[in-house]
């Protein structure tokens, strides 16, 4: 399965719904899309089934920039927490 991205906006907030496998090969496209969706961006991860390490680091950076992560699977949250602790 590949990554599919659905975008919804109400004028103030853009929600990017990520569906499927989010792997490092898609990060350039995802970064560019996030940049064009300002001022407020939400990443909805409800239908994400797989991520890799580069994506976890990208999600950590997104949070640091104020991007909200919604419906993030427990394994991704735990992986992000481990990465943060490792960087300390």
Tell where the protein language model's regions lie, with residue ranges.
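Short beta-strand/loop segment at the start of cytosolic alpha/beta domains
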Residues: 1-14
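Charged, elongated alpha-helical/coil segments that serve as electrostatic interaction surfaces
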Residues: 2-3, 86-88
């Amino acid at each position: 399965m590949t990554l599919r991205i659905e975008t919804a906006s109400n004028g103030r907030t853009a929600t990017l719904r990520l569906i499927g496998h989010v792997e490092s090969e898609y990060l350039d496209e995802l970064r560019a899309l996030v940049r064009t969706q300002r001022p407020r961006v939400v990443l909805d991860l409800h239908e994400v089934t797989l991520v890799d390490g580069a994506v976890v680091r990208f999600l950590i950076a997104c949070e640091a920039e104020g991007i909200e992560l919604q419906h993030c699977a427990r394994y991704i949250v735990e992986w992000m927490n481990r990465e943060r602790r490792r960087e300390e």
